[in-house]
């Protein structure tokens, strides 16, 4: 059985996330997805959606066989437990595959590291772009404390 690990924040799920997971699943039999902990996200703004809800959403996706939260202190701990054959990186994840491969070897892990390409030129395949679109199109009507009809959101 070929085990694949995909990782990410998965805040504001969008088709780019689904593409990444579908392409990752094609590389093996069992897809494990490690969802970043809220407190560990330091390379971009903190997630909007809490980690437990992001985990629940990722776990419900068809390509995902197992979803788990990352470790709060050691990102390699779940990888050591899973012992994957392949670790996939999204096209915009800030990991150098060569550096990651060396870090894995230092822990006696021999997973192949594969970067998954982008989903194409889709406007809303980025959580940042989704937030920007909400601000641009709905910002004035989304005031804190204002009674807003959910249909308007």
UniProtKB/Swiss-Prot annotation:
Its cofactor is a divalent metal cation. Keywords: ATP-binding, FAD, Flavoprotein, FMN, Nucleotide-binding, Nucleotidyltransferase, Transferase. It is an enzyme of class 2 (transferase). Its EC number is 2.7.7.2. It catalyses: FMN + ATP + H(+) = FAD + diphosphate. GO terms for biological process: FAD biosynthetic process; FMN metabolic process. It comes from the Archaea. ATP binds at residues 9-10, 14-17, 92, 119. Pathway: Cofactor biosynthesis; FAD biosynthesis; FAD from FMN: step 1/1. Homodimer. Catalyzes the transfer of the AMP portion of ATP to flavin mononucleotide (FMN) to produce flavin adenine dinucleotide (FAD) coenzyme. Belongs to the archaeal FAD synthase family. This is FAD synthase. It comes from Methanosphaerula palustris (strain ATCC BAA-1556 / DSM 19958 / E1-9c).
